[in-house]
Amino acid sequence: MAATKDRQLFRHLLRLSRFDRYNPLFTTFAGLWSTLLAGGAKMAEQRSDMSVATVFQQCALCFVASYLFCGAGMVWNDWIDRDIDANVARTKERPLASGKVTATEAMVWMVLQAALSWGVLEVMLDGKDVAKHFIPVAAASVLYPFGKRSLARMLGIYPQYILAFTIAWPAVIGRAAIYGQYESYAETLRQCLPLCTMVFFWTIYLNTAYSYQDVVDDRKLGVNSFYNIAGKHIHLLLVALVSPILVCLPIYLFELHSLWLWLSWMGVWTASLAQQLVQFDPKQPASGGSIHRSNFILGIWTILACVVQVFLTGSA
């Protein structure tokens, strides 16, 4: 009986971290892209001892660190929002909102995941600047649920800003996994700025479309969300958010000198984003969910494109 209850609790904890869904994988994309392409660039340098195996090893560590920390962030979000979630149709069955997991159990689970994520970063970065890479995303994750409150809206702060930062930040960690021992923290930030900016706006775009599914319930409860800034012009807002994506991505790709990436990343993303904007229907909030899924597929595709780039560099 006790074993059965433990298994049920473990399943609920996995659900609490969204490990039963694809959403946490979004937090791994920027780190994986950055690690793979930094690894490819390092391999292309003269007298480089970087191997394909090392690149993939660092890539795996970056994935685990990001995935675990995302799980911790999901728990924190639900811990803060449990009373709100209990009154929203889409979220009322979440483990904390429904009472399947207690607040104490959730907090212990969150701390465990955050500690494991820190440990993985220690290994990946060889102990260098771990706090500098961990604290910014931790602080943003703590603030995220409060960005949905009415006070945040009055201050011009929307939760999508904070979420976008947390999803873009692993790009910095990914580059540090390859170049961290060879360049300063400030230089890593500078090199990652175009990619981070691109991912920042990409995340706001896809999350604005995704959260628009809850527009009816959110307006009843006064939940703050970025689509509020557009009013009835949500479609125009999404178009505006796509624009900086298509500006920053070429800036990042220009330094990599890869025709393959221009075709497989810039080309595919441009076509896909255009198709998404055509298919989005403001009168059908559920259409925001299809944009979310389409961008998940784009993220997976881009990982594969970056893997190919590593092998192209390794064989050159």
Curated annotation (Swiss-Prot):
This is Polyprenyl transferase dpchC. InterPro entries: Prenyltransferase, UbiA_prenyltransferase, UbiA_prenylTrfase_CS, UbiA_sf. Its EC number is 2.5.1.-. The chain crosses the membrane at residues 24-44, 60-80, 105-125, 154-174, 192-212, 234-254, 258-278, 296-316. Keywords: Membrane, Transferase, Transmembrane, Transmembrane helix. The keyword Membrane applies. It is a multi-pass membrane protein. Pathway: Secondary metabolite biosynthesis; terpenoid biosynthesis. Pfam families: UbiA (PF01040). GO terms for cellular component: plasma membrane. It is found in: Membrane. One of its GO terms (biological process) is terpenoid biosynthetic process. GO terms for molecular function: transferase activity, transferring alkyl or aryl (other than methyl) groups. The gene is dpchC. Belongs to the UbiA prenyltransferase family. Polyprenyl transferase; part of the gene cluster that mediates the biosynthesis of the diterpenoid pyrones higginsianins A and B. The first step of the pathway is the synthesis of the alpha-pyrone moiety by the polyketide synthase dpchA via condensation of one acetyl-CoA starter unit with 3 malonyl-CoA units and 2 methylations. The alpha-pyrone is then combined with geranylgeranyl pyrophosphate (GGPP) formed by the GGPP synthase dpchD through the action of the prenyltransferase dpchC to yield a linear alpha-pyrone diterpenoid. It is an enzyme of class 2 (transferase). Its cofactor is Mg(2+). PANTHER family: 4-HYDROXYBENZOATE POLYPRENYLTRANSFERASE, MITOCHONDRIAL, PRENYLTRANSFERASES. Diterpenoid pyrones display various biological activities and higginsianin A shows anti-HIV activity. The keyword Transferase applies.
